[in-house]
């Protein structure tokens, strides 16, 4: 039986940033990231991470109910449901001036897709 997602956790993290290694340039001496951890019904963990920020964190937290309980094998359907919710709730999701994409939706979908694919790969192995 294909595992189901039993839990989605979102961990905002911050740390010191080395400005010489930051592709986005010297904006601040720190970084923020959102780490998403999905647990499936087999007890396995899938992990993903994306840039931080309150909008991204809030959108991830708002997506928990759409992800929890879904089948790992139907990850594309899960992502479609999350995208539909984002399309309704995130106004003016525009690209920023920095060299990385600041659109909330792009990062939220990536933060969920990466651990789903992590779990799918473990299941198919």
Model segments located where?
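Metal- or metallocofactor-binding catalytic centers and their adjacent structured scaffolds
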Residues: 39-124
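Structured beta-strand/loop patches that form or line metal/cofactor-binding pockets in enzymes
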Residues: 1-47, 51
């Amino acid at each position: 039986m294909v595992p189901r997602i039993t839990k989605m956790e979102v961990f905002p993290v911050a740390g010191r940033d080395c400005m010489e290694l930051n592709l986005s340039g010297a904006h601040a001496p720190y970084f923020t990231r959102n780490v998403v951890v999905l647990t499936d019904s087999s007890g396995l963990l899938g992990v993903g991470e994306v840039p931080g920020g309150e909008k991204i964190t809030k959108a991830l937290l708002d997506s928990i109910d759409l992800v929890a309980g879904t089948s790992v094998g139907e990850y594309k359907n899960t992502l479609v449901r999350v995208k539909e919710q984002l399309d309704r709730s995130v106004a003016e999701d525009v690209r920023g001036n920095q060299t990385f994409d600041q659109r909330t939706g792009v990062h939220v979908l990536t933060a969920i897709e990466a651990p789903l694919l992590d779990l799918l790969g473990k299941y198919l192995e």
